[in-house]
Amino acid sequence: MHIHKKDLIATIKLNGEEINLDTANQLLKDPTLKPCHIVIHLEGVTELDEEQLDALFYLSEMVRAEGEHSFVVVYEHYNPDEFPEELIACPTLQEALDIIEMEEIERDLFDD
């Protein structure tokens, strides 16, 4: 696992073996990630099983629970027909950053 933080965005690179509930809980307990939008970059991962998707969904729900932070999965093999609607995902890091920016604008508009 590799974590890179820039401004209020934490990009976390995970390999296939690291995508599980233990890793999700470890990330949720990290106080340095609390104020951040989270991007999970599944670099080199070619397939996701149901257990891995469940772990990503759990992490997404926990991060987004308070409505203040975004959670996006970067998965280069992303296919919207095969990926759960509940998870926000895209094939590139730039798209993930764009999604976070759009969600920030939405939050600002609806908070006023």
Where are these regions (language model features)?
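Amphipathic, Lys/Arg-enriched alpha-helical "gate/interface" segment within cytosolic domains
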Residues: H2-D112
